[in-house]
């Protein structure tokens, strides 16, 4: 078990799974509605993934279009772009995912890891 330093909670985690969820939300328009109310930022162990998910949720709730460019701009506006690894990190994460086919299952696993 590891500790998320931002939320000071201890839980098992899977960084690849976190990135799969975030990447799917960046590449497919229908992805964020599937996880927006099922996942909470504190369910992400990796700080960068937590910050990216916070930005994704805010964009979704504000009805903003989500893709790697708009997410980059949102993170920059929040002063978090460098903290998450910059635009190349966003591209790296999104390039690891080819579809959101297993997104709901991945979200379920993240929830289970957090409990």
PLM features: residue spans?
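Noncatalytic partner-interaction/assembly domains of nucleic-acid and motor enzyme complexes
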Residues: 1-113
């Amino acid at each position: 078990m590891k500790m998320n330093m931002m939320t000071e909670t201890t839980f098992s985690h899977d960084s690849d799974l976190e990135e799969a969820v975030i990447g799917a939300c960046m590449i497919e328009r229908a992805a964020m509605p599937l996880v927006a109310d099922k996942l909470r930022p504190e369910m992400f162990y990796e700080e960068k993934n937590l910050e990216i998910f916070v930005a994704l949720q805010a964009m979704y709730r504000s009805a903003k279009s989500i893709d790697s460019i708009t997410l980059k701009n949102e993170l920059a506006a929040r002063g978090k772009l460098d903290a998450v690894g910059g635009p190349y990190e966003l591209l790296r994460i999104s390039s690891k995912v080819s579809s959101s086919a297993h997104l709901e299952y991945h979200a379920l696993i993240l929830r289970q890891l957090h409990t």
